[in-house]
């Protein structure tokens, strides 16, 4: 933990950082596109799209893949319902015990002890994610056992790479103090771009992308 001692605030993405979503969100994206087009994009198709840095939202990524494939594109609300059916396999706002979707196939990439160690080192931490709130709360609170973790999820702020959510949570955790350093740990081009935009909007703060 000493290597991170200079980090006053450490913010995490969730998908691809806290949990592996290759068999859940990515799979739901593939199945959704296949449902509407008969074509199932492979991992490289999705990676190329994500590498553009503008498709952090998997619903919009699904729609964009369908547009580029040609043919009819469904209504966004209808696509979201179909996607959620694959991912949650039940009511997103309902009892997670009744979910039967791909969300059950998400290996954790960290252990709860990590956050105890961060707190013990005086590092303030939280999560900025494009995940739906029920999904984010499920992994953080039920699977990791974190109590009311600082979180910005889908709908709390504009989608990344807009830095609003990142800046907002950093300000909340700073609590009026000037941070020594703010690091954001993500896994996509959109996450890096979010930090770049945060630097432009708050150049007085020391932003770092991990």
Residue ranges and their predicted role:
Residues 3-5, 120-123, 172-181, 199:
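Glycine-rich phosphate-binding loop signature in dinucleotide/nucleotide-binding domains
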Residues 5-12, 18-109, 134:
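N-terminal helical cap/lid subdomain that shapes the substrate entry/recognition surface
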Residues 17, 29, 103, 111-142, ...:
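Substrate-recognition element of Asp-dependent hydrolases with the DxDx(T/V) motif
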Residues 124-126, 150, 183, 208-210:
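A structural signal for isolated positions on well-ordered beta-strands in alpha/beta enzyme cores
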Residues 146-164:
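A short, structured active-site edge motif that brings together acidic residues
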Residues 160-176:
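Short loop-to-alpha-helix "cap/lid" segments that border enzyme active sites
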Residues 184-210:
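Acidic, Mg2+-coordinating phosphoryl-transfer loop and its flanking beta/alpha structural elements
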């Amino acid at each position: 933990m000493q290597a991170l001692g200079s980090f006053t605030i450490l913010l995490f993405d969730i998908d691809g950082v806290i949990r592996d979503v290759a068999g859940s969100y990515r799979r739901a994206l593939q199945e959704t596109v296949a449902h509407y087009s008969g074509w199932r994009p492979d991992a490289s198709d999705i990676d190329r799209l994500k590498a553009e840095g503008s498709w952090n939202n998997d619903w919009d990524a699904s729609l964009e893949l369908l547009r580029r494939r040609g043919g009819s594109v469904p209504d966004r609300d209808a696509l979201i319902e179909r996607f959620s059916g694959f991912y949650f396999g039940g009511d997103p706002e309902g009892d997670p015990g009744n979910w039967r979707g791909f969300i059950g196939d998400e290996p954790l990439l960290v252990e709860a002890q990590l956050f105890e160690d961060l707190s013990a080192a005086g590092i303030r931490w939280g999560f900025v994610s494009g995940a739906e709130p029920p999904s984010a709360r499920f992994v953080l609170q039920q699977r990791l056992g974190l109590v009311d973790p600082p979180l910005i999820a889908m709908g709390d702020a504009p989608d990344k790479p807009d830095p609003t959510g990142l800046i907002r949570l950093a300000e909340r955790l700073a609590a009026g103090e000037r941070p020594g350093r703010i690091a954001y740990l993500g896994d996509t081009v959109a996450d890096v771009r979010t930090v770049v935009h945060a630097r432009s909007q708050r150049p007085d703060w020391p932003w770092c992308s991990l």
